[in-house]
């Protein structure tokens, strides 16, 4: 059985494929600390949603998401995260949308300097597919973990 795992670095994503030996990466980016001069004027993500669209290389039938708050000194509180097949631009196919859970809960808090991985979720992901990841934040750090090339 093929599996996929998506690692999400605060606003950046990594997708991983599972084999009998373990998980294998299919999309990746590196987490970075933010440089204040590169942040938008208002970077407050509290009570906002962010959608990141990634193009995976391999597909599978299971997905997980890993979120990182490794470079922040404040916790991140996430109300929910859902994934869906991305259509044109940032539109999604609503029939494909599925919510992720963390320890069987939709809401998750990521402590400062830590990462967390979602529960495995059955999901039909095709090779080279565009996947939309939508994160609904309750509160987020003023200086987040980012990837400077991803201005989402």
Across the structure, where does each feature detected by a protein language model lie?
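Bacterial Sec-dependent N-terminal signal peptides
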Residues: 1-23
